[in-house]
Structures are given as structure tokens and as C-alpha cells.
């Protein structure tokens, strides 16, 4: 009998949706594309529009760096806006970029229900639409999506969790947990990937697996969830979080409680690298699943140019592989 225990805890803050991607396996051949929107143009003639989730997140800032690097290298004009993780604002940004004369537009579809109508409307006006980090399953007009293989990232996190237990002799009745965010598809995929691994060891290692709750992308909420979990499960051995903000909050709770619980996060933002390498925090925040947002930004821009110039994309879905960061490969610029 599974010991999956859901803690229903109140959340005091609600933020908008964060990054979300897919876990589909990309096709082996580039799909046929419609006629490009800017026939006869070269890369240097193009004006391309981009809508980030929020510059408050280091992840999106790195995506923007990749976009701007592609702009400098290829010569197109990049107009980069942000949606503050709000679908209604994302829709307004799309309309602004259409009016501004962009040859193609790409966005992180953090709220598909709210922003898909604007995506479809822009496509109907002849502006090719692309997506990065998070796409929409509610329309088929998106020419190309570039994002992280989030399910595989969850698998990496699950494997790291089990390895920690094995390396530290905690394979007989340990308690492990997860802080989730079951709204963005990316975080759902990460959670499912993690469970696919740890559930295989539940009976073998007599694990107690605890779902700490939904942190809603907010570090303060994550701290509260972790505080409550440590009261109920003071011997918690390890947790996995679906985003680094959850680790930031959980770290504070673990230190305050004097717990020996360790954490494995997801994103590998700069604060994760710093914590992993820190003499004290690194004893708790031991690893993180890394994405490559710079590459995501560069690749989506590259495919937008390709589509506008000759009507092709590398693939309709391009997934960037995640990897584990720990003390052996973490770095601080």
C-alpha cells in the first residue's frame, strides 16, 4: 500500500504561473512548414517579437540573453517584452507586437487559456507564432516550440534522491517528500518524472513519500509548507522541489528547525549554484536539475529566422535535455 500522504496546507500568497514546457519526444524529421510570413527577406530585414514570462526570474533573463545573442549574430531586430506571468498581459503584448509590425512572434505561454485566443488571432493576421519554455495544447498554429524536457528532469531529480538515500545508508524506512506546483504543465511533468523513479523504490526501501503541497511559485509559501512538514515528519530525509524558489523557502525552514533534511531543486539558477557551493547551505541544498535557458532563447530565435526566410524549422518540438548540478560541477560567475 502506498504511503503517499497529501498535506493540505493553506497558501498565503498567490502568484501567476511560471515556466512550463513539455515532455514530448521531438520528431526525427523537420515538419513541413507553411509559406513564410516574410518572403524574400533576409535575417537582417526581420523584426521579431518575444514575450518573456517575467524578468524577475533569472530563468527568463537567461532566455533573453540567448535571444539577444542570436539577434547580434544573425542581424535581426529583437523586440523583447514581458508578461509578468499574466495571460491577459501576454495577450496585450502579442497585440502590441502585431501592431508594431513584427514578422514573427514568440512567447512563453504561461497561461494557455488566457493567451491562446491572441495567438490564434495573430496567426490569422499572417504573423507566424512560436513558443518557448511553455506552449499551448489548445491550438495547432504554433510553428515551433523550444523548451526543457521537464519529465526527464523529474527523472533526474528522482534518481538523485534515491542515490542520496543509498549513499547515506537511508534505505530502510526513510521519509522523503516533494514540494510541487500542479498548475504549470512543466511542474506537473517534473513531479510525474520524480514519482516515476521514487515509486519504484517505495516497497523495496519501505519509503514514506510525502506530498508537502503546492507552493504556487512563491518562496514564502514553500517555507511555510516545509515548516509544517518538519513538524509532522521531523525525520524527513530528503525533498525534491519543482522549482528553485521552493528550495529558497525550504532552506530557511530546514535551517530554522535544525533539520538534517537535504534538498534537490529544479532550475539551477545562480542562487542554487551559490547555495550548493556554500560551506553550510551546501550541506542542505545538495543538488539541482539544470535547464539551459540561454540555449532555449537562442534556438527559438534561430528557428523564427529560418521560418521567416525559407519557411522551415528544425523541428516542431525541440526539447533541451536537463542535467544534474552538484558540488562537482556547480559554478559561481
Q: What does each of the following model-derived ranges do?
A:
Residues 1-9:
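Positively charged n-region of N-terminal signal peptides that target proteins for export
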Residues 13, 20-333:
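A residue-level marker of the well-folded mature domains of exported/periplasmic proteins
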Residues 8, 17-18:
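Intrinsically disordered, low-complexity terminal regions enriched in Ser/Thr/Gln/Glu/Pro/Gly/Ala
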Amino acid at each position: 500500500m502506498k504511503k503517499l500522504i497529501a498535506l493540505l496546507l493553506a497558501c498565503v500568497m498567490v502568484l501567476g504561473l511560471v515556466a512550463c514546457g513539455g515532455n514530448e519526444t521531438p520528431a526525427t524529421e523537420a515538419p513541413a512548414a507553411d509559406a513564410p510570413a516574410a518572403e524574400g527577406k533576409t535575417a537582417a530585414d526581420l523584426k521579431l517579437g518575444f514575450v518573456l514570462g517575467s524578468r524577475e526570474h533569472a530563468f527568463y533573463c537567461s532566455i533573453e540573453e540567448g535571444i539577444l545573442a542570436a539577434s547580434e549574430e544573425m542581424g535581426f531586430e529583437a523586440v523583447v517584452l514581458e508578461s509578468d506571468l499574466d495571460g491577459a498581459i501576454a495577450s496585450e503584448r502579442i497585440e502590441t507586437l502585431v501592431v508594431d509590425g513584427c514578422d514573427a512572434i514568440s512567447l512563453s505561454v504561461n497561461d494557455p487559456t488566457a493567451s491562446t485566443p491572441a495567438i490564434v488571432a495573430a496567426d490569422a493576421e499572417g504573423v507566424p507564432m512560436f513558443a518557448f519554455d511553455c506552449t499551448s495544447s489548445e491550438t495547432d498554429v504554433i510553428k515551433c516550440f523550444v523548451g526543457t524536457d521537464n519529465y526527464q528532469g523529474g527523472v533526474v531529480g528522482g534518481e538523485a534522491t534515491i542515490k542520496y538515500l543509498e549513499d547515506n545508508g537511508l534505505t530502510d524506512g526513510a521519509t522523503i517528500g516533494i514540494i510541487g506546483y500542479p498548475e504549470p504543465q512543466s511542474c506537473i511533468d517534473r513531479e510525474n518524472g520524480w514519482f516515476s523513479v521514487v515509486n519504484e523504490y517505495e516497497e523495496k526501501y519501505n519509503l514514506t513519500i510525502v506530498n508537502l503541497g503546492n507552493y504556487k511559485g512563491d518562496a514564502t509559501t514553500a517555507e511555510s509548507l516545509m515548516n509544517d512538514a518538519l513538524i509532522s515528519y521531523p525525520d524527513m530525509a530528503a525533498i525534491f522541489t519543482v522549482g528553485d524558489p521552493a528550495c529558497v523557502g525550504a532552506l530557511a525552514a530546514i535551517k530554522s528547525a535544525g533539520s538534517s533534511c537535504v534538498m534537490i531543486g529544479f532550475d539551477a539558477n545562480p542562487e542554487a549554484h551559490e547555495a550548493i557551493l556554500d560551506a553550510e547551505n551546501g550541506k542542505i541544498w545538495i543538488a539541482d536539475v539544470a535547464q539551459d535557458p540561454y540555449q532555449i532563447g537562442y534556438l527559438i530565435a534561430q528557428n523564427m529566422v529560418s521560418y521567416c526566410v525559407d519557411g522551415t524549422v528544425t523541428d516542431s518540438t525541440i526539447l533541451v535535455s536537463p542535467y544534474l548540478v552538484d558540488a562537482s560541477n556547480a559554478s559561481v560567475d
